[in-house]
Amino acid sequence: MAIFRDQAENHVEHDRSIEDRRRHRQLVEKSIKENLGDILSEESIIGETKNKKYKIPIRGIKEYQFIYGANNKGVTTGTGEERRGDRISSDKRKAISNNKAGNQEGKDIYETEITLEELMDYIVEDLDLPNLDRKKYSEIIVESAAKKRGYQKYGVRPRLAKKKTVMCKIARKQGKKRALREIGEEAEIGRFPFREDDLRYYKVKKHPKKESNAVMIFIMDVSGSMDNTKKYLARSFFFVLSRFIRRKYNNVAFEFISHTTTAKNVNEYEFFHKGESGGTYISSGINAAIDLIKEKYNPGVWNIYPFYASDGDNWSEDNEKAMEAVNEISDLSNMFGYIELLPSTYSTTMFYRFKKEISKENFVSVTVKEKKDLWNAIKYMLSEELQEKNKE
């Protein structure tokens, strides 16, 4: 028996346009997430302002309609595991095939724009930083900004509540007028200066706040073998990583180290914009990070996450020193990440030796062989599953 429902009482809940708008938002978000890798590998986002806009292609939504099939024999059925938008038809017709004209209608494609700030929102949603291990003081107590909590009669001049002070003076003046009227005097009150009793100061209270106690150490090979493409990929990796962490945590320290055969601590601007040339001693950059940790960041107190980016091309006499340095910094860190960029030959780079000889559970290595691999490398380094794997 057919069942009919009267939807006239509530048009809003059954408004077809609401479902269309919801579906549209889903497609927009899906397209943005699918194109994150293209933006990171093709667009120069380093140093851009949060208002920089990027164009994202989005497939249009059509009204549901019945269409003629290909009139083929047989019936196509699903498996029961289909999702919305999946095609179960065996029809293989395409709008264009082998560079020849097709006979099918094309898809509506249009572009939407998002800012760098919005892009970072999607990156934050798509990634998850490995959970900071609990240290003795992994959550430090800091004082948040002081908040005003009423008034008091004493304090320092910068906290003088001018409006409240004037109101106290006016109240005192009005009180004097009332007193004069009560005794039958109507004398005009002349100059009426402020007195110490009129002054009011803001009463402030600071609230303790817990924040993560972590340091990120970025180490980058800037030697002659690191061409512009490799340096661009390395800087893109570090830029996205730094922006992501700063949005997720309030109290994270950053250190920047660049190296050739020698290493030096640099500021953030120099790290992302300044280039050098020369030979490569991988150990120099990692040892500089080790010295920095021993000098400023006690591993018993701090959560330490060094990340090192290089093309893996190392001077042969430094290979053993590099192995020792990686083992040592892994012992001092929660996780040490090694990113190898566009290696010329897999077996001749340090990635092969690190993978074979470094047995530390918290040592994580990835290779970026093409620009499109950058996004997967970032996700792999920062995935929550990776943290769980390291704890096993």
Curated annotation (Swiss-Prot):
Give the transmembrane region(s).
Answer: none
**Stretches for region Disordered:** 75-100
Q: Source organism's superkingdom?
A: Bacteria
InterPro entries from the UniProt entry: Spore_YhbH, UPF0229, vWFA_dom_sf
For bias type Basic and acidic residues, the affected ranges are: 80-94
What SUPFAM superfamilies does this protein map onto?
A: vWA-like
Pfam family membership, one? DUF444
The entry assigns this protein to a family as follows: Belongs to the UPF0229 family.
User: What protein name applies here?
Assistant: UPF0229 protein CPE1333
Organism whose genome encodes this protein:
Clostridium perfringens (strain 13 / Type A)
